[in-house]
Amino acid sequence: SPADVTIIIHPVNDTPELSEIGDQEIYEDEIFEYILTAINVDDDQLFFNATSFSEDIGVKVADDTLTITPNANWNGAADVTVTVSDGFLTDMEVFTLTVRPVNDAPAAEDVAIFPSVPLETHDLELSYIYTDIEGDPESGTEITWYKDGVELEEFANQLTIPSSATLCDEVWHATVTPSDGTDVGEL
């Protein structure tokens, strides 16, 4: 006599597959954004996450958008681990984000003219502190002197105005435009 056999095939949860990200590059002071994708034959809801052991970057995932924010003026490489999960099974990828350096503009700080209350017999001395985050040397900094609001080209790039060029009741000021030979800072 014939026998009937019935089998029931139960679905198996398949691991979601994270789409390849690959190594990525950005420039210093930029934010990296990437839309994460994955394949899931079971049509399960997927959850993305990302982490990094580097203290030089901030990593966040909102829905399927990965955002990496490097610290200001930082450049270098950081490994990032991205995972996708259906709540039970997980796939992951580790990629390297390389942050390329850019030349930052230098700054002139603590700009001052001494003495602050000069007499007609005093030379005027300009002082400032040159700073550059990369440590580039000062090259091509421009100094502009003004007397009573009028630029005096004969004293361009001079740190000292001799007392013979000043008179009582004149108003003097100076601007410093710092330069590292490539970029110039703000006045």
Residue spans for each PLM region:
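PAS/LOV and related PAS-like sensory modules
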Residues: 17-21, 108-111
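Acidic, turn/loop-rich segments in luminal/extracellular domains of secretory-pathway
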Residues: 1-14, 22-104, 119-186
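Pro/Thr/Ser/Gly-rich low-complexity, intrinsically disordered linker/stalk tracts
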Residues: 109-119
